[in-house]
Amino acid sequence: RQPNIVLILADDLGYADVGAYKADRYQTPNIDKLAKQGVRFTAAYAAAPVCAPSRAGLLTGRYPQRFGFEFNQGPGNREFKEGYGLDAKELTIGNVLQTAGYKTGLVGKWHMGIADQFYPTNRGFDEFVGLLTAETSYGDPAQPGVRVWPKDRAAAAAATKDGVFHRWPHAKILDGPSRTPVTDGKEYLTDYLTNRSVEFIERNAKSDNPYFLYAAYTAPHSPHMVVQKYYDRFPEIKDELQRINAAMIASLDDGVGR
């Protein structure tokens, strides 16, 4: 039997945010354990400095400049249109592993096209739950104990009917090819993505076939938002943004430890 594979990707996690790289403010014991037991690539570079092409490089193994995917999608970008995404001729690691008999799943952030031809279940993933674009709310800021920085972002998120921070369309968490919205903002997003990842692993561990999970967390990417149970771990950090960022990283690390 081929080995199972879990690829975990953080979003906007800095080199100095992880204990294994001598971070002195943040706590990442689970990520540190992986680093200690495995290999640290201290001279590795991302394929691009921004989200979408960097992810394209990771999943295809090719420089994104070679297939014309060099920019993020966003409302201020000329590339924000349904025809822009990861070229359909490019194979992803999901495509390759599907061919090798793997059950493939993506939980989390895609950010490589919103049209059907770019949808994850058409790009090598048997299952998908997550968001298609760059960011969304981590929860409903109207709920007690939710911390947001800056506070005006809380007002923008609370103004929506479902507690989702809509900087652009397609920001909801979707499930499967039907694009069914699946969250109501009451469960912290990082915890939700962890739970769905664990569910995928546990379900497929019972199969005779190997599985590949791409767990693409949104944390600690903006919006800077966290729930009280993580915020309370860092009373010594007085700067509000730094404290929320530390708490978001702690929630990510807890998920890795699951």
Give each language-model segment a name:
Residues 1-258:
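Formylglycine-dependent sulfatase
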